[in-house]
Amino acid sequence: MATTIDQTSIKSLHFHQVIRLIITIIFLAFLFLIGPTSSMNHHLHESSSKNTMAPSKRFLLQPSTPSSSTMKMRPTAHPRRSGTSSSSARKRRREFRAEAHEVPSGPNPISN
C-alpha cells in the first residue's frame, strides 16, 4: 500500500505539532519550577535578614555644650631652639621654602 502525498503531509504536520507540544510542556514545567524557587529564595532571604538583625533603635546623645558654641582647636606654639641647626634641617628648609621657579604655560606636554 502506497501512501499518498496528502497522507505524508498530514503525518509531517502531526509530527511537528507533537514536537511543539512537547517543547511547550517542557518550557512551562521549567517556568513552574523556577518561579516558586526564586520567590522562596527571596522570602527566605527576607526572613533570615529579619531574624539575624535585631531591631535597632537610634538614640542621639545629648550634647554637653550647646551647638552654638565652638571648640577652639588652635595648636600650641612650641618655642624655637636657638643655636646651630643641623644640616638636615637646613636642607628641609631649603627644599620647602624654595624660591620661585619656572612654570611652563600652555597645555600639559606630557598628556599630548
From Swiss-Prot:
It comes from the Eukaryota. PANTHER family: CLAVATA3/ESR (CLE)-RELATED PROTEIN 41-RELATED, CLAVATA3_ESR (CLE)-RELATED PROTEIN 41-RELATED. GO terms for molecular function: receptor serine/threonine kinase binding. It comes from Arabidopsis thaliana. Keywords: Developmental protein, Differentiation, Glycoprotein, Hydroxylation, Secreted, Signal. Glycans are attached at residue 107. Residues 41-112 are annotated as: Disordered. Belongs to the CLV3/ESR signal peptide family. Residues 1-39 form the signal peptide. The modification Hydroxyproline is found at residues 104, 107. Residues 62-71 have a biased composition (Polar residues). This is CLAVATA3/ESR (CLE)-related protein 44. GO terms for cellular component: apoplast. The gene is CLE44. GO terms for biological process: axillary shoot meristem initiation; cell-cell signaling involved in cell fate commitment; maintenance of root meristem identity; phloem development; phloem or xylem histogenesis; procambium histogenesis; regulation of cell differentiation; xylem development. The keyword Magnesium does not apply.
